[in-house]
């Protein structure tokens, strides 16, 4: 979701 991890879109 774009919080701390770019992969955790």
From Swiss-Prot:
It comes from Potamotrygon orbignyi. May be produced from creatine kinase by limited proteolysis. GO terms for molecular function: toxin activity. Expressed by the venom gland. Belongs to the ATP:guanido phosphotransferase family. Keywords: Secreted, Toxin, Vasoactive, Vasoconstrictor. One of its GO terms (cellular component) is extracellular region. This is Orpotrin. It is found in: Secreted. Vasoconstrictor. GO terms for biological process: vasoconstriction.
């Amino acid at each position: 979701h774009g919080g701390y991890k770019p992969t955790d879109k």
